Amino acid sequence: STMREITGKELERTLLKTQGRTWDGVPLPKLSVTDLKQDAIQLFKEKSVRRGRLTQEDVKVSDEMLMDNLHLIDENGYLIRAAMLAFYNDPEKWVTGAYVKIGFFGKSDSDLVYQDEVHGPLIEQVDKTVDLVYTKYMKALIDYEGVQRIEQFMFHKDAFREILLNAIVEHKLQVGGQAGLRKT
């Protein structure tokens, strides 16, 4: 048998695993449903109904019931980290770097031309980031049909949104830090 010392993130993952938890499932006893941003919860409800994930009846419940239905409240009645990331106004209060950073680089890795940061609840970060990337960072082929301007981007917005969501979730859950986008 060999003895091995583990520290840092590896130790945290091991301890959580022995408790049957994941990083995003850690309870936050000092956070309550009333601390969550109402606009973010409302945005979630609207998007869920519009995309057919939930019905109008599903979202006509109290915020506490919604969080419970989404499994964002643990067995002791505490909100978990995932709820805070998705709906809390300032998730950086709880998790350092819980924001998206976007950079436009010139000819080299050290040639940062300009950058932006997107803060707030994760549910809002995604839409704000997609809008920012499509208006400021991504180039489109432009065509005209009569007087109407038609922009054709390299990625369909829904596909880019999915890529962005995967990058954010993967980064936040494994590293617990900021997600970054790089455009060269």
Predicted feature residues:
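Conserved N-terminal catalytic/coupling substructures associated with nucleotide/phosphate chemistry
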Residues: S1-T184
